[in-house]
Structures are given as C-alpha cells and as structure tokens.
Amino acid sequence: MAQEVIKIRGGRTLNGEVNISGAKNSAVAIIPATLLAQGHVKLEGLPQISDVKTLVSLLEDLNIKASLNGTELEVDTTEIQNAALPNNKVESLRASYYMMGAMLGRFKKCVIGLPGGCPLGPRPIDQHIKGFKALGAEIDESSTTSMKIEAKELKGAHIFLDMVSVGATINIMLAAVYATGQTVIENAAKEPEVVDVANFLTSMGANIKGAGTSTIKINGVKELHGSEYQVIPDRIEAGTYMCIAAACGENVILNNIVPKHVETLTAKFSELGVNVDVRDERIRINNNAPYRFVDIKTLVYPGFATDLQQPITPLLFMANGPSFVTDTIYPERFKHVEELKRMGANIEVDEGTATIKPSTLHGAEVYASDLRAGACLIIAGLIAEGVTTIYNVKHIYRGYTDIVEHLKALGADIWTETV
C-alpha cells in the first residue's frame, strides 16, 4: 500500500522565521470542552493538525454544528445529542479520553471506545477513572473495546491523584464543572495547558480556582454560556524548533512563544552553550556547536518536558563528550534510539537512561514510532550527511503543523514522496 515518506538531504544551514502554532495539548482538551457550553463557542489559534480534525468530527457525531476554518473553530451545541462513540476515530487518538469527562459532565453518561494515540508503554487512565468514581460515576469496563460511564448525580469530591497527571487533572475538571458542590483536586498537574483549559472553562462561566498550582478547586455551576477564546502557543512545538535552530540554524527567529513556558529548555541550552536571545514573544537562536555535554532528566512541569527529550537528543551528538538523558515520566520512550543507530549514532539505552556520545550521522531509512520520535529523526536528518528517509510520518503530522513547509521556508532540503 502506498504511503507518504519525508526525505531530507542534510547539511543545509537554516535561517528565517517560524510562527509557532497553538498548543496541541490544549486544543485536544478544549475542543471536547466546548460540548459543555450551552450555545456558541469560537476558538482561535488552533494548530492545523490531524488530531484537531478528528475531535471536530467526534463533536459532529454528537449532533453539534462545528465549522473548522484554518486555525478557527466555531461550535454550536444547541441541538446536541448524546451518542455512543466506540469507533475508529477514538482509537486513533489518545486525547479522545477528554470526551469522557466532557460527556459525563454534560450528560452524566457516556459510552466511548478505548483511546489510542502514541504507543509509549503503559499510559493507564486509572487516575481518570478514580476521579470519575469519586464524583459519583459507575464504570462498566466489561467490554475490551469500549467503556461505559454513568452517574445518577455528580457530586463534588476531594480527589487526591496518586501521580501527577495532566490528562486526569483536565478530565476531572471537565466532569466537575456541573457537579453539585465543590470538587478539590490535590496533587494536580501544573502544566500551562491545564491552566489554559481552566481559563477556557472560566470564560464560559465555570468557577475554577488554583489552576497552575497543585490544588485546584472547582465549584459546580448550573450552566456554561458560549465564549470566544484564544489557545496558548505550543511550548513543545516551540521547543522542537529551538532544537532545530540549535542543530543547524543561523539566526532563526521563533514568533508567538511564551518564554516562561520554555524556560527549562532555555536553561539547558545555556548549559550546552547555544546562543539564545529571549524577547517578549520571540526567541532568536544560532547554532554554536560544538556544544558542552550535559545531563537531562525529564520531570513534570516546570521540569524538563518528556516531550522534548527525543527532539534534543540529536543536539547531544554535537557535544564534546558523553551526555545522559533519563526519562522519569515514560521510561520506555526510547524507540528512536534504534533508528538513530541506523544513522551511525553512538547511543545506548538502559533502564530509562540513554547514553549519547559524539557522533557523525549519515542518511538512512528510519521509522517514526511516535510523534516526538519523528521530530527527533527530522532533526537527525537535517544534520546528517546524505539523504534520510522517514517512514510512518502520520505520527509527525498528528502534532506539527506544516513542518515540511516550515523547514523548506527556512532553507532545508526536505520533501515528501509517495512510495
């Protein structure tokens, strides 16, 4: 069967500007959250990625009028109807689990297929389920392909998350906005995307306090009205382009960025010796290799993002000694390692830690196992000698708006082919 591949001829120096898209991890929660509104919602600044289109079509399955035009989405929930969603759309997208919290909040009942997305080892939704149960929901998991969640009444509850989880924090917020009384989430995730979703819900009339701290309080309301809302910029896309610029850029400028959201990466760049100039909503970066070797450990926000440990890896081949990358969030998130070895990389992984030694990469045929692995392989291809061919690029398109066109505009020798 024919498939699209990305091809890169490495060695070009990049320069120019990139406008960073809206945050994928906000958009995939805010779009399901629109079904909680009674009336019209307009979202602006959405990323133009396949996940957004999938979620919009799930809204349409609930008889919601939804019009997606570029980065804008208009939603009218006036004729909303509950419906079962155990279908292939749900399976293709992990963030479809936000439909659970939103539908539970709106209808007190939902039947939904089990979510898919990037295969990153164990990513259970037990904390989500714990939260739903605390609010009064009963869960039927007897089916292997779908889940039924139902509540006679949703009542506020005190919920302590056993582990910090962005998905569970947001999903509980979605389910709790219409619950009677107060819901308190302890050990809540502090990510900017959690704050963004809370701000969106608040713009519709929800009563949420403490988003961005470890304790979030939600006082249930009777109704949420329509709203217009602008999604925050994507800190992971920004971080990926920062890594691209540090690898092979000369005067690359990134616009529409919140510097505070990428502070940990900027600090790591200072350690490496990358030239970084931070302004209000833009960052300028120059390649300044060879770099200093560093240690990186992923942590929950505001620590180093797990989503950036793969994109930063190719930079470490340009360092003057061995670097170590430990992923404490997803210790199995190292499927890119074998692909990098095909390109001549001196890299080994053992129990969640990669040892990365200075290497000269050459073009090869490689396979993107997940979204951020795909970003890593693109950066590796940009600095490699010869042509790199990346297969399974659908993962890359799930999270990066027009990445091939953006890189072409910066001067990269990159193109797509059908094989």
UniProtKB/Swiss-Prot annotation:
Q: Which residues bind UDP-N-acetyl-alpha-D-glucosamine?
A: 94, 123-127, 307, 329
Highest taxon, organism lineage: Bacteria
A Gene Ontology BP annotation from the UniProt entry:
cell division
| Location in the cell | Cytoplasm
Reaction it catalyzes: phosphoenolpyruvate + UDP-N-acetyl-alpha-D-glucosamine = UDP-N-acetyl-3-O-(1-carboxyvinyl)-alpha-D-glucosamine + phosphate
Chain sites annotated for binding phosphoenolpyruvate: 24-25
Pfam families xref list: EPSP_synthase
For the protein in the UniProt heading, the enzyme class is transferase
Which pathway, per its entry? Cell wall biogenesis; peptidoglycan biosynthesis
Keyword list (alphabetical) reads: Cell cycle, Cell division, Cell shape, Cell wall biogenesis/degradation, Cytoplasm, Peptidoglycan synthesis, Pyruvate, Transferase
Q: Where is the active site?
A: 118
2-(S-cysteinyl)pyruvic acid O-phosphothioketal-modified residues are: 118
Family annotation (PANTHER family): UDP-N-ACETYLGLUCOSAMINE 1-CARBOXYVINYLTRANSFERASE (PTHR43783), UDP-N-ACETYLGLUCOSAMINE 1-CARBOXYVINYLTRANSFERASE 2 (PTHR43783:SF2)
Q: What does this protein do?
A: Cell wall formation. Adds enolpyruvyl to UDP-N-acetylglucosamine.
Q: What is this protein called?
A: UDP-N-acetylglucosamine 1-carboxyvinyltransferase 2
- Organism expressing this protein natively: Staphylococcus aureus (strain MRSA252)
